[in-house]
Regions:
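Generic N-terminal amphipathic, Lys/Arg-enriched alpha-helix
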Residues: 1-16
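A short, charged, Gly/Pro-tolerant segment at domain boundaries
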Residues: 158, 164-181
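Short, well-ordered alpha-helical segments in soluble proteins
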Residues: 127-130, 163, 167
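Hydrophobic packing residues in well-ordered alpha-helices of helical domains and bundles
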Residues: 4, 23-26, 48
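A short, well-structured juxtamembrane/interface segment
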Residues: 17-32
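Glycine-rich phosphate-binding loops that contact phosphosugars or nucleotide phosphates
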Residues: 37-41, 46-154
Length: 181
């Protein structure tokens, strides 16, 4: 249980170090009426899918880039990209393509440099360790990009909750939960 306690402490430190204005900007983005598209590679892509699912439960129209049923993105749509490094090839290519359509592109990353790109209309910088272990990153007992992926999952789930008018939305969200299992 020491490892679990250490990971929980890492999450507390990382999540409380997130810029409050960036976080609130993401919450406001989620309140929008447009369609939401999510993209990410590897474990970050799995987190993106989990967040897309939860946002769908909240009543939003949501798609995951790369799925066969994902339609074309358009001007009033929002693309949320998860990339720990902020430079993952496919995620950045998807961001550029979406930006060209006029869609709003929002990046969730550890990289303060990546957010300088004019492709991104907004960002949420999570000050977590990456697989590169760059100077200035927090220490972690976890391998690779675990710290970023876990913090992204916690923060984005929290942002969905904060975006809801009714904080106790469980019953309403259950209506959108699968009933085929």
């Amino acid at each position: 249980m020491k490892t679990t306690a250490a990971i929980l402490e890492e999450m507390r430190a990382v999540c409380t170090a997130v810029d409050a204005e960036q976080y609130q900007s993401f919450v406001e983005l989620l309140k929008g009426d447009g369609r939401f598209f999510f993209a990410g590679e590897g474990r970050s892509g799995l987190v993106a899918k989990a967040i897309a699912m939860r946002l769908m439960h909240s009543g939003k129209t949501v798609y995951v880039v790369g799925e066969t049923t994902t339609p074309a993105i358009a001007e009033k749509d929002i693309l949320i990209v998860l990339s720990g490094s902020g430079k993952t090839g496919q995620a950045m290519s998807v961001s550029e393509n979406a930006s060209k359509t006029g869609a709003k592109v929002f990046l969730v990353t550890t990289s303060k440099e990546a957010v300088q790109s004019p492709v991104f209309a907004g960002c949420l910088v999570i000050p977590a360790a990456t697989k590169y272990r760059l100077p200035g990153e927090p220490k972690t007992i976890q391998p690779l990009g675990n710290q970023f992926d876990q913090a992204a999952h916690l923060l984005l789930d929290a942002a969905i909750i904060d975006s809801l008018e009714e904080k106790d939305a469980n019953d309403e969200m259950k209506k959108n939960h699968t009933n085929l299992e």
